[in-house]
Amino acid sequence: MREIKLRTSQRPRPLPPGRWAMTQRWNDLLFAHWQATPGAVGRLLPEGLQVDTFQGSAWLGVVPFWMDRIKIRGVPPIPGARSFPELNLRTYVRDHRTGMQGVYFFSLDASNLLAVAIARSCYHLPYYWAEMRIEQQSEREFAFYSRRRLTRTPVIFKARYRGLGPTRRLAESRSGTLEYFLTERYYLFAHNRGGELVRAGIHHVPWPLEDAEAEIERNDLAEAIGIQLPDQQPVLHYSRRLAVYLWPAELVRPALSPRRAPAVVTPSG
């Protein structure tokens, strides 16, 4: 496979060692973010991770989108995975030993069962198989629906959203802004069934963000993990498209408890 020269000037750390393992393209994303208390989020994190905060607040993000151009290095295309919708619930963390910032996913829903199985096996991520659809209403307007399969209690997300077009303020998120804090993350963290903390490197160019509007009719994702979202309008952004590179998951350290008391860190600036 031909190697691609990657832009790295925006990264706070060098690229991970070795070669990337997978590429994907993420399309028509809504970033919906709510402030949360650090303690409420921290109690759900695995040992070894701290809540990363912006101006004293933790943040929970719900991100619906659809992906395509999925390629695993050295592996034929995944059957039926040419493109499919995805939905995730995430927060922002640091490794308490190294300070490395990243994303921690509480849940990820996808409509392709084989892709769910591969992601669970290779990246230890909490993927769920879901009935999903995304319908384009206009150039930047979408209707999104997700209902998790094989669960006792329905976990449903239903929303309409639209991007409002690029602005100079959001043309490219800058360090120190909330937009940068929420989107410029280059590692994902998870814990496997043995309670071991794992991480994987991610690479992309800076997110091209737009302001957005959304009508969220139903959102059960946070309640499914025991968090009540505040009754307030979320911070909304839209992004048209971004190519993403993922490195293999690696073990950070063994023998961790899957849950512990909250640990919180506030970034400088």
Task: Kindly label every feature range from the protein language model.
Residues Q35-V51, F84-G102:
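N-terminal short leaders/motifs
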Residues Q55-A58, V63-R97:
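Long, hydrophobic/aromatic-enriched structural stretches that serve as scaffold segments
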Residues K5-Q10, I78-R90, R133-E139:
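Short, surface-exposed, charge-dense and proline/glycine-enriched linear segments
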Residues L29, N88-G269:
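Internal, well-folded beta-alpha domain core
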Residues M1-R73, E217-D220, I227-P267:
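Hydrophobic, proline/glycine-rich low-complexity stretches
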